Amino acid sequence: MIYFIQVITRDILKNEENAVNKEELNNLLENVASGAISPKEAADSIKIESFKDLGFAKVDTNRELRQGMSEVIYGKSKTKEQIAGIVGAMLEEKEKTILITRMSREAADYVAQQYNLNYDELSQIGIIGDMPEKNGKDRIVVATGGTSDIPVAEEAARTAEVYGNEVVRLYDVGVAGMHRLMNHIDTIMNARVIIAIAGMEGALASVIGGMADCPVIAVPTSVGYGANFGGLSALLSMLNSCASGVSVVNIDNGFGAGYLASMINHM
């Protein structure tokens, strides 16, 4: 069986046509283990290349098999034509849902002329394809210190939703009015993962981390005045949190927080 898995891995990296996803591969391996098909028959049925070379991009067509989630398109700094080209390549590889982050309105309008795009301007998230059924173990809570943090929060929330998670939004519950957060204490205590998003001094993550019994993913934002240094003060505050179980992603990185929260919620 070890040899067969090695053969499968080698063929995955070599073959040129994509016809299988992770679930199908698992079913294939189970059929081999049960004797329903031979290793050779299974190997012959797998047609996957590791990437599709577009010249300006090498689309990772094998990522869902390795990581359980397909490649995400980072829209910022890409031309609208490049984004559309990558989308087309992914659809050719039978991707069911494509997530595009940091997508401008101009790029969204261009891509929407060619594909069925669901675009949210606040989060700059573009989604092509069907949203999956909710398959996470429990709920992910996304909380913000202020209304100004919502664009980053929506990037996190929509990312988590694309990967099949139920998301509860708690917006504008920062430390300037603790009673707002305490009014949702049951939601905090019953979450499986919490994403705490805040600018200014970034205190929200520590406060939530001191109450919750689940992992807290802290997201510093660039919201704030001069000494906020574009989110650096919030970042350092969150990194130095005294609360246990608080991890930190990069400034304004809602996508990273949503992705990590989804992984935790599927464990």
PLM region spans:
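Short, Lys/Arg-enriched N-terminal segments with co-localized hydrophobic residues
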Residues: 1-19
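Short, acidic/small-residue loops that bind anionic groups at enzyme active sites
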Residues: 118-122, 208-232
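Glycine-rich phosphate-binding loop
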Residues: 183-221
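Long amphipathic alpha-helical segments
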Residues: 19-104, 109, 113-115
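C-terminal binding/interaction regions
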Residues: 223, 227-267
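Glycine-rich phosphate/diphosphate-binding loop of Rossmann-like nucleotide-binding domains
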Residues: 137-177
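Short glycine/serine/threonine-rich phosphate/pyrophosphate-binding segments
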Residues: 83, 149-154, 178-179, 198-207, ...
